[in-house]
C-alpha cells in the first residue's frame, strides 16, 4: 500500500481507507489532544489499515518557538477510516531537530546596534552564533487554538473535523541581535495552520515592527532525514519530471528564470512513503518576485528541501505592510 505524507509548506495527509464507523464519528477523521497552557498539541490521523500517525507540535529549539516537533506511529485497532483515539504506545518515526517553520535573514534599515552584524539567519532554530547555539534570536509571543470553531483556552481531547492553530513570535535582526539575548525585535511572524484529516493549510505573515530589509527567506522547510533519508525528489514544473536521488548530493528545480512556477516538491523513500510540499505561486511571496533568475525556484541540500521565496532581490517593508506566503 502506498502511504503519503503531504506538506503544504508542511501538509500531512493520510490515505483514506475503507471501513465502517458510526455516522457521527465517521465525519471526524482526526483525533486531537490540545494543551494550550503547556503549548503541546498532538494530531492523530489514519495512515494505513493497522497504523495511525501522530503529528506533535510544541515549543522547540533554542528559541522555543511553537512548531512541528515529532511524528509518531502507533497501532490502530479499529478497521475503519478514522484513527483509534489512543495516544499511548507511540513510537517516534521522525524528530524535527531543525527549522520547519523557517528562519529569516533580516536587518533593520536604521539604528544598527547589534553585537555581530554579519548577515545570518535569525528565528527558527538559529541562535546568536548563527547556528543552534548562543543566545535566543526570537521569542514566542502567543498560541491560540480552535477546535471545530470553538476556542480552546485550556485542554481538549477528542475527535474533530477542524483544528486551527495560530502562533506568533517576534524575531531579532542580524544587525540588532545581542550576545546576552537582549537584541531588538524587528519583525513579527504570524503562522496560521488549519488541520483537517491530517492535512494542514499553512499561512505565514511577516509583519515588520520597524522598517526592515529581508535578504533571504524560504518559508517552511522539510527535513528529509530519518524516515525520509535517502529519498528521491521531483519538482513539478521544474527542469525535469524525473526523480532526483537525494543521496547523490544537492539538486534543484532549475533556475527561476527558466522555471519560475515550480509549485510542488515530492520526496519518496524506498518504501514509497511520500512527502508532498506545495506552494501557492499566485499569492504573496509565492510569486517569487524577489528571487533572482539565476537561483532555483526550489532545491534540496544537506537533508532538507526548500522553496526560494526571497533570494537575490531584497524586500524592504515598513510598519503597516507585510510579506505573506500560503501553501
Task: Please provide the spans of the model-predicted regions.
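Positively charged n-region of N-terminal signal peptides that target proteins for export
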Residues: 1-4
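Bacterial N-terminal signal peptides
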Residues: 8-16
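Acidic (Asp/Glu-rich), glycine- and aromatic
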Residues: 187, 198-240
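Active-site/ligand-binding surface loops and adjacent short beta/alpha elements
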Residues: 222-223, 230-302
